[in-house]
From Swiss-Prot:
Positions occupied by motif JAMM motif: 173-186
Keywords: Hydrolase, Metal-binding, Metalloprotease, Protease, Zinc
Keyword Repeat: no
Name of the molecule in the record: UPF0758 protein PM1152
Ranges where the MPN domain occurs: 102-224
């Protein structure tokens, strides 16, 4: 109780040093990033206003340069810094996948795929190639555009898998509409890839469909 009361009286930087970053609210984390407020507006007030404008950290971090810089108190310097922080986070998650048994940390896989795919304007079909201990060998964007049976070629996926000696695959693609519910075509493509993979004893561990702040897992829904 004493620590809780004490944390309320601390500025964000001091609070982070005392209790660690997870103890901070979104507003406090953003205030540290912004560093200073503007005339007539403290940094905490500015942080609160920014989050209200973009609705969430996700909304802020996915904003375009124009959307970001049109808000009073934000400029090109902060936009560049935010893009750098976002990219470092993505690369950190990718390194985590390489250092861990990927499927035993499926939440990390999902977070990484959401970070890399959910704000894309076109559909992108990615494949994570894993070894027999489910560690990441490589990640590859295989196909761009509308995902259907005419644009996705299972043989190309299997060819890449055999070339890098992959034992298992995780499939993923995004829905720019924001709705992750798989289409009939998504299901058919997944079935064809799974059938082709089984012929060479490669497992399909999951197929993630990434929407806006949400996802659909074929494995979790027992479609694999």
């Amino acid at each position: 109780m004493q620590n809780q009361v004490e944390s309320l009286s601390l500025m964000p930087r001091e609070k982070l040093l005392r209790f660690g970053a997870p103890a901070l609210t979104d507003e406090e984390l953003l205030a540290i990033f912004l560093r200073t407020g503007i005339k007539g507006c403290s940094v905490m007030q500015l942080s609160r206003h920014v989050l209200q404008h973009f609705h969430s950290l996700r909304g802020l971090m996915s904003a375009t340069q124009t959307e970001f810089c049109q808000l009073k108190g934000l400029g090109i310097t902060q936009f560049i810094q935010l893009q750098a922080c976002t990219e470092m986070s993505k690369r950190y998650l990718q390194e985590e996948l390489k250092l861990t048994q990927a499927f035993k940390n499926s939440e990390n896989v999902r977070f990484y795929l959401q970070a890399t795919l959910e704000n894309k304007e076109r559909e992108i079909f990615q494949v994570l190639f894993l070894d027999n201990q489910h560690r990441l060998i490589k990640q590859e964007e295989m196909f761009l555009g509308t995902i259907n049976c005419t644009t996705i070629h299972p043989r190309e996926i299997i060819k890449s898998a055999l070339f890098c000696n992959a034992a298992a695959l995780i499939l993923a693609h995004n829905h720019p509409s924001g709705n992750p519910e798989p289409s009939a075509s998504d299901k058919m493509v997944t079935t064809k890839i799974q059938a082709a993979a089984e012929l060479v004893e490669i497992r399909i561990l999951d197929h993630f469909v990434i929407g806006k702040g949400c996802y659909y897992s074929f494995a979790e829904n027992r479609l694999l």
